[in-house]
């Protein structure tokens, strides 16, 4: 990457990103033009051609004429369907109710399958890490279905070693130890044959002490593998057998149920004002408060939060927001990240796949980089802050409370626990979760109040949309309730529900991604929240002032905007003109993860094809570090790398554009890159994506399959 701007100026001191490395691979990638990488585009200067430029067409990426391709000269593929909802809740997608309907080659693939990727015959777990002649004892003995002879396994049942990354296991290279043992696809790089006293040759695994010393833990509670927020098998089994008690959630849920019934009885038949609110005199309010039972306990004091202009945030992304991708974004400048959305019931039941979503890398648990200012709330301790938060979904208060309690018990190293009230997927909506809660304000307030009560020191946040239906936004009414507390809460003297931060996605559920996000409405909501934060003391009933522990951040509620951020110009505009505390970025980061770098440096980064390929290489390394370097781990890494490439291929280099800033809603006409690799990275064909993964993960397993999210590309994929 070059460090000059388009007019030859150097970036501000300390702001230039570190140069990317070329792929350390036996596959050499070069720009066929032989030219150095293009310059960065300066913030305020659009690219120009000699002479007059054609006007910018709405909805079409403004690609320079010399890079356009005659579509009549190439085969026409099926039109691309909008797949952006897939990043919301891919593995919670709706299922087709009418099985008799004739399938159409369009829309999203639901219930996708990915084939299988494992050894022809597995190695017995008692042998995986043991020297050849000193295996552990197998409890199944002769009845064991796995291979016990190490040399037979290596020769007949395990695929040949990979030659990518110079033939060296990237996990062993980084940590001095490989956690896949003999099953590693690079095992030749960390094994040797030694002579035994009886004259035999014994195969043994090798560890590198020097490499271990160079890989210290970044946080004290991370595991040897650099992971945190993991739950033990015993604890998961105890959850599945209902042996883990949730006394705080149970007590608070009972109180909520009892109080709700009493309140409903009190309000029934009372006359309402024009706003639909039942009015009480001061004496009546005091009488009602005296009749209600106090909550069983008050919330624990929460860690103070901070969101600011220097803290761009990666949105919770199902499937796409996996650990390797989050790790990549953190490295590129994301200051806060979230887990994929986890469903409350599977968490309560100890489901392995759901708890796996909470695993985080130690780089996600380091403090964010912030600029101290008067906007930081009193009591905020940056050294105790971290980048990683969890997001959950629930349709009933007791589910959300139980899930929150077990999360705070088994994964205490969370920045926040966020409640998803924005997911538009039909399956969740029909169950009353996700965006369905946008129409049940009182219920949502109860859920958040209860979560705040049982979460120990972890703050609670919420992500919402404009509303459920187009032309009927109700987010501002909801926000006022979440900041100040609803009418029922004031009647009981409870005050605000304890939400520390609110994120608003500028679209309705009905709208999905068909139109631009409404940043005008987001700006109005930001102004409303600032006003409510200032007036909170005036609006609070001073006689029944809520306990300070119920008020996160000393009473300040942070507000984040979300939707269509695709450049540092978009980000700055939202901060300065919409008035949000920070911006949450979803699709923009999937298409170009270095968007966080652009925000830090304040300029467009025209990444060359080889620089972009180095990010693909990093994802592959991080995937093997996360899921393992054995056959299964390589297959999982390939699958999620393909998922990311299905979004990343939408990127059109800024050096090819007539106008800046780019618009995330624009779709490009047929175009070619500045070299073959840039063209390959932009391909919309799954076979080209697989070709890219094979540069780092080797040939795909014969049984590997990949079904893209969009059915126009839905072919059986065999590597």
Curated annotation (Swiss-Prot):
<dbReference type="Pfam" id="PF01207">
    <property type="entry name" value="Dus"/>
</dbReference>
<dbReference type="InterPro" id="IPR000571">
    <property type="entry name" value="Znf_CCCH"/>
</dbReference>
<feature type="binding site">
    <location>
        <position position="505"/>
    </location>
    <ligand>
        <name>FMN</name>
    </ligand>
</feature>
<keyword id="KW-0507">mRNA processing</keyword>
<feature type="active site" description="Proton donor">
    <location>
        <position position="423"/>
    </location>
</feature>
<dbReference type="GO" id="GO:0050660">
    <property type="term" value="F:flavin adenine dinucleotide binding"/>
</dbReference>
<dbReference type="GO" id="GO:0102265">
    <property type="term" value="F:tRNA-dihydrouridine47 synthase activity"/>
</dbReference>
<dbReference type="GO" id="GO:0106414">
    <property type="term" value="F:mRNA dihydrouridine synthase activity"/>
</dbReference>
<keyword id="KW-0963">Cytoplasm</keyword>
<feature type="binding site">
    <location>
        <begin position="562"/>
        <end position="564"/>
    </location>
    <ligand>
        <name>FMN</name>
    </ligand>
</feature>
<feature type="region of interest" description="Disordered">
    <location>
        <begin position="1"/>
        <end position="117"/>
    </location>
</feature>
<feature type="binding site">
    <location>
        <position position="391"/>
    </location>
    <ligand>
        <name>FMN</name>
    </ligand>
</feature>
<protein>
    <recommendedName>
        <fullName>tRNA-dihydrouridine(47) synthase [NAD(P)(+)]</fullName>
        <ecNumber>1.3.1.89</ecNumber>
        <ecNumber>1.3.1.-</ecNumber>
    </recommendedName>
</protein>
<feature type="binding site">
    <location>
        <begin position="316"/>
        <end position="318"/>
    </location>
    <ligand>
        <name>FMN</name>
    </ligand>
</feature>
<dbReference type="InterPro" id="IPR013785">
    <property type="entry name" value="Aldolase_TIM"/>
</dbReference>
<keyword id="KW-0862">Zinc</keyword>
<feature type="zinc finger region" description="C3H1-type 2">
    <location>
        <begin position="168"/>
        <end position="193"/>
    </location>
</feature>
<dbReference type="GO" id="GO:0008270">
    <property type="term" value="F:zinc ion binding"/>
</dbReference>
<dbReference type="GO" id="GO:0003723">
    <property type="term" value="F:RNA binding"/>
</dbReference>
<keyword id="KW-0539">Nucleus</keyword>
<keyword id="KW-0677">Repeat</keyword>
<comment type="function">
    <text>Catalyzes the synthesis of dihydrouridine, a modified base found in the D-loop of most tRNAs. Specifically modifies U47 in cytoplasmic tRNAs. Catalyzes the synthesis of dihydrouridine in some mRNAs, thereby affecting their translation.</text>
</comment>
<feature type="compositionally biased region" description="Polar residues">
    <location>
        <begin position="1"/>
        <end position="10"/>
    </location>
</feature>
<feature type="binding site">
    <location>
        <begin position="586"/>
        <end position="587"/>
    </location>
    <ligand>
        <name>FMN</name>
    </ligand>
</feature>
<keyword id="KW-0819">tRNA processing</keyword>
<keyword id="KW-0288">FMN</keyword>
<keyword id="KW-0521">NADP</keyword>
<keyword id="KW-0560">Oxidoreductase</keyword>
<keyword id="KW-0520">NAD</keyword>
<dbReference type="GO" id="GO:0005737">
    <property type="term" value="C:cytoplasm"/>
</dbReference>
<dbReference type="GO" id="GO:0006397">
    <property type="term" value="P:mRNA processing"/>
</dbReference>
<feature type="zinc finger region" description="C3H1-type 1">
    <location>
        <begin position="118"/>
        <end position="151"/>
    </location>
</feature>
<dbReference type="InterPro" id="IPR035587">
    <property type="entry name" value="DUS-like_FMN-bd"/>
</dbReference>
<dbReference type="InterPro" id="IPR018517">
    <property type="entry name" value="tRNA_hU_synthase_CS"/>
</dbReference>
<keyword id="KW-0285">Flavoprotein</keyword>
<feature type="binding site">
    <location>
        <position position="463"/>
    </location>
    <ligand>
        <name>FMN</name>
    </ligand>
</feature>
<keyword id="KW-0863">Zinc-finger</keyword>
<dbReference type="InterPro" id="IPR041367">
    <property type="entry name" value="Znf-CCCH_4"/>
</dbReference>
<dbReference type="Pfam" id="PF18044">
    <property type="entry name" value="zf-CCCH_4"/>
</dbReference>
<keyword id="KW-0479">Metal-binding</keyword>
<feature type="compositionally biased region" description="Basic and acidic residues">
    <location>
        <begin position="88"/>
        <end position="100"/>
    </location>
</feature>
<dbReference type="GO" id="GO:0034399">
    <property type="term" value="C:nuclear periphery"/>
</dbReference>
